A protein has these predicted regions:
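Cysteine-dependent hydrolase recognition
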Residues: 1-213
Length: 213
């Protein structure tokens, strides 16, 4: 089909999935066949994923991505879960039409529940607490979200954390800088027995970007 495409967005999604993102999140227009009118994610892209050892959890607040009860349609959500070479380990996603205001509530409640620094939380617990969140006022909308996957699975939270104790406030191109810190547990205690390599990622300053309508 014709229409504008965002090929860079499609490539970036595939790269993040392949690298093993913990959670892949999308909120916006979509349907049974994928995300967005520009088809930034579709069945062809999903079926090409080969991230079998690095399966993320998908949180998608978009219409009917996993309409599993229509035998005539193989939905994008089903393709993500059942891709034999990759895809996702589970999805908190939609089986029917949903609406933007309610989607934002569910999306925010999910992340506040999933990333509350509580180790060992199962997907079923996260799903339950998300659906019961006081933030959600549109319960008709939230009932169209379902957990597709094993509710006993835990998110792959890192057991070790990197804590910085000294970071320069300014970094310029080609500068040599010294950053100090330590590897610790979730409580901030130093893990003196740690023996490994820490790979830093440096981000540029925030920038505003305008995309096509």
């Amino acid at each position: 089909p014709g229409g504008e495409r965002y090929e860079d967005a499609t490539s970036e999604i595939a790269r993040r999935v392949d690298e093993g993102a913990l959670i892949v999140n999308y909120i916006g227009h979509g349907g049974e066949r994928g995300w967005a009118h520009e088809r930034i994610l579709n069945l062809e892209t999903i079926n090409a994923w080969t991230n079998l050892r690095r399966l993320p959890v998908f949180m998608t607040a978009t219409c009917e991505l996993f309409r599993y009860d229509d035998p005539d349609i193989y939905s994008a959500g089903e393709a993500i879960l059942f891709n034999p070479q990759g895809g996702g380990v589970a999805l908190l996603t939609t089986t029917r039409t949903v609406y933007s205001s309610g989607n934002q509530q569910v999306n925010r409640a999910f992340f506040e529940t999933a990333l509350d620094d509580t180790q060992g939380r199962r997907l079923g617990d996260i799903y339950r607490d998300t659906k019961n969140s006081e933030q959600i006022t549109s319960h008709t909308n939230s009932r169209n979200f379902s957990l597709m996957g094993d509710p006993a699975l835990e998110l792959a939270y890192p057991a070790k954390h990197v804590y910085f104790t000294e970071v320069p406030d300014t970094m310029r191109s080609l500068d040599e800088v010294v950053i100090r810190g330590y590897v610790g547990n979730a409580k901030g205690d130093v893990l003196s027995e740690f023996d490994g390599v820490v790979v830093p990622t440096v981000f540029d300053k925030r920038a505003s970007v305008t995309t096509l309508d």
